[in-house]
Amino acid sequence: MKKISVLIIDDSALIRKLLTEIINARPDMEVIGAAPDPIVAREMIRTLNPDVLTLDVEMPKMDGLEFLEKLMRLRPMPVVMVSTLTERGSEVTFRALELGAVDFVAKPKMDIRNSLEAYTDEITGKIRTASTARIHRLEPVASNGAASGSIVQMPRHHGISTEKLIIIGASTGGTEAIKDVLIHLPPDCPGILITQHMPEGFTRSFAERLDRLCKIRVKEAEGGERVLPGHAYLAPGHSHLLLKKSGANYVTELSQTDPVNRHRPSVDVLFQSAAHCAGKNAVGVILTGMGKDGAAGMLDMHHAGAYNLAQDETSCVVFGMPKEAITLGAVDEIVPLQDMARRILARLVGAGKQAVRV
């Protein structure tokens, strides 16, 4: 079997050496080159034709974002970003995902050798996922990063109970998919709970970014909040997010119990809590991502009476989690990403023609 070929682009010689050691220790992948900056990397990409790049966010000679944008316009290929856990680092990372990077890993700040080696499974797993990801040529985007398209309006002749909820789970490619859904939702939509696989330290910045772009309010969940219409609550990178009932109200709860499906936060944990607390009042949404997290929980939601939607294969970066949920029989409707917001709202009011019925 052909090994996944990886080109490392990082201005730190130590990081290049450590990443090379980690990647070459895996039997299914190998480093075929390492460049200190994008200028050197350009020629190596032409001559070596790697399957995946790892790209440092901030480098001399050419900014990582500038290089990524040119790459995705001229020669689209799978890229995993290596990012610092700073406010600027996280903002640059989310811009990189907008430009077409498949995923990112955090660059450790202290005791680099030990902490980076602890990331071995994460780094190699994301390289493996990136090698199979669906990559699109970058098209021109708005300078503010906002997605195109208008807000989907709630039909005025249909009332939506305040009991209704939207429950979303995603992984690889999910930051852009979640943005593309939320940015089209009106401020009077039902409350939303979201689990996106993301390292601790990035979820707050992600929530703040969504809050700036969307008509609804978006925040990192703190636990104990009442779930309000027009508000979305994002699982923090260190905790599972659960839906609970407190009297007549829905509230959020955080848990630091063991990872589920190797993830904390886990989509299964959120979906299972929604099945228990919300039942038929929930609409479940599973978006792009590698693995099976969320499939079993979505089946629980289905059995509890929820209506579930899955992102279709064509619009997914990685058609893993949606495929697993579909295979289990947990999904009621398969929807292209560009139609997801409309279909969610149509289902909540019981209106509209179904897209692809499973």
Swiss-Prot record:
Gene Ontology CC terms: cytoplasm
PTM annotation (4-aspartylphosphate): residues: D56
GO biological process: chemotaxis
PTM: Phosphorylated by CheA. Phosphorylation of the N-terminal regulatory domain activates the methylesterase activity.
EC number annotated for this UniProt entry: 3.1.1.61, 3.5.1.44
One term of GO molecular function: phosphorelay response regulator activity
Cross-referenced Pfam families: CheB_methylest (PF01339), Response_reg (PF00072)
Chief site of localization: cytoplasm
Residue ranges constituting the Response regulatory domain according to the UniProt record: 5-122
SUPFAM superfamilies, per the entry: CheY-like, Methylesterase CheB, C-terminal domain
Limits of the CheB-type methylesterase domain: 159-351
Highest taxon above the source species: Bacteria
Compartmental location: Cytoplasm
Active site: S171, H197, D293
HAMAP family: CheB_chemtxs
Family membership noted in the UniProt record: Belongs to the CheB family.
Protein role: Involved in chemotaxis. Part of a chemotaxis signal transduction system that modulates chemotaxis in response to various stimuli. Catalyzes the demethylation of specific methylglutamate residues introduced into the chemoreceptors (methyl-accepting chemotaxis proteins or MCP) by CheR. Also mediates the irreversible deamidation of specific glutamine residues to glutamic acid.
Listed name of the protein: Protein-glutamate methylesterase/protein-glutamine glutaminase
Gene that encodes it: cheB
